[in-house]
């Protein structure tokens, strides 16, 4: 499966990929998980060396949520209710791991306009709105690259050590554009737990993440 964002894998029941280790197999949330007040299970695929309560940076591509949760339906966008349920699920799961986690949602101006009610009612999140089709991607890449720079400093002798950088990234996305950044963070000892909003994910992004969970979309009534 291909798109403007590169080759994509359908999930969660896709064939095994050559070169993909068991540590990268996809976890699958129940199909109706967005309707349930439960948290996503903490994936065993994350490294054993993580602290029991790692500091978390949680990033959400709201464009991917808006379009991904509409996969398999005649709609091009998810409803406000579906988007809100997804964001609440991710936020609740993140806060369970790190109550002080930094949570950032990025959206293009078109997505922000479509889901303005969700944005204005969303508490505890920082919203970044950018123009253009890849505006949300660029905003999140800046956050990932900033975290990379901080961890590079930690590996340089004689440099002042920054206080409390994130030790785990929870990323809600589908596009391959994030693969390089999370691969670099992984080499610096910062794993990424990828949450996929929908049925497909770019192959490069899937293989770069340490753990993958598919969220929805919810089954449609017949």
Enumerate the language-model features and the residues they cover:
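Domain-level signal for Mg2+-assisted phosphodiester chemistry and nucleotide/NA-binding surfaces
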Residues: 2-14, 18-136, 145, 191
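Nuclease catalytic cores that cleave nucleic-acid phosphodiester bonds
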Residues: 110-222
